[in-house]
Amino acid sequence: MVSHSELRNLFCSADAVCFDVDSTVIQEEGIDELAKFCGVEDAVSEMTRQAMGGAVPFKAALTQRLALIQPSREQVQRLLAEHPPHLTPGIRELVSRLQERNVQVFLISGGFRSIVEHVASKLNIPSTNVFANRLKFYFNGEYAGFDETQPTAESGGKGKVIKLLKEKFHFKKIVMVGDGATDMEACPPADAFIGFGGNVIRQQVKDNAEWYITDFVELLGALEE
């Protein structure tokens, strides 16, 4: 068991910090917003709830939800133009502070790369530091499925990405920050996990995370000490 003060020290000395995106870096769940935009909100948000609670394997839940939504390329582009995701208060300052300290910041999401890259651009995070699912479209722009080879398409995918980052960049300390069970499961291989409940509180995470925050100000404060 790592003590709270050890966790704080680990966060402050990390050479990489990985953030979940939906309900962590942004206030919304991207897939639910896409479903709402495409007119199938209720059915899809119930599936998301089950997936986040760990009741359904991630890839199966993603396949089912996308089969309902059937988003076209144009719908995704219009969603970003008309209803762009809202950054969670404090995240811009936190990411900026980490980058000033030469900490690598990554976004690891079970959501969609087109949405996550839009978020990354707002935070000055290079697209090479984004790991998310890729939607596939036919040449006419209609939905053609998703890239099932991406690690983020699987249960345990976030842990696979972190393992890959350690192998590639030889990071000594990686911290994962997120709201969901899939984020908590990424530690290990992450060296520490910080639960985030600023947008939605998932009881399983709140009960089991050694360090649980509801405001990014707390992490900013730890860096300033």
Curated annotation (Swiss-Prot):
It is found in: Cytoplasm, Cytosol. Binds 1 Mg(2+) ion per subunit. The modification N-acetylmethionine is found at M1. One of its GO terms (molecular function) is L-phosphoserine phosphatase activity. It comes from the Eukaryota. InterPro entries: HAD-like_SerB, HAD-like_sf, HAD_sf, PSP. Pathway: Amino-acid biosynthesis; L-serine biosynthesis; L-serine from 3-phospho-D-glycerate: step 3/3. Mg(2+) binds at D20, D22, D179. O-phospho-L-serine binds at M52, S109, G110, G111, K158, T182. Phosphate binds at G53, T182. Its cofactor is Mg(2+). It holds the Pfam family Hydrolase. The active site is at D20, D22. It catalyses: O-phospho-L-serine + H2O = L-serine + phosphate; O-phospho-D-serine + H2O = D-serine + phosphate. SUPFAM superfamilies: HAD-like. One of its GO terms (biological process) is L-serine metabolic process. Its main location: cytoplasm. Its EC number is 3.1.3.3. Keywords: Acetylation, Amino-acid biosynthesis, Cytoplasm, Hydrolase, Magnesium, Metal-binding, Serine biosynthesis. Belongs to the HAD-like hydrolase superfamily. SerB family. Homodimer. Catalyzes the last irreversible step in the biosynthesis of L-serine from carbohydrates, the dephosphorylation of O-phospho-L-serine to L-serine. L-serine can then be used in protein synthesis, to produce other amino acids, in nucleotide metabolism or in glutathione synthesis, or can be racemized to D-serine, a neuromodulator. May also act on O-phospho-D-serine. This is Phosphoserine phosphatase. It comes from Bos taurus (Bovine).
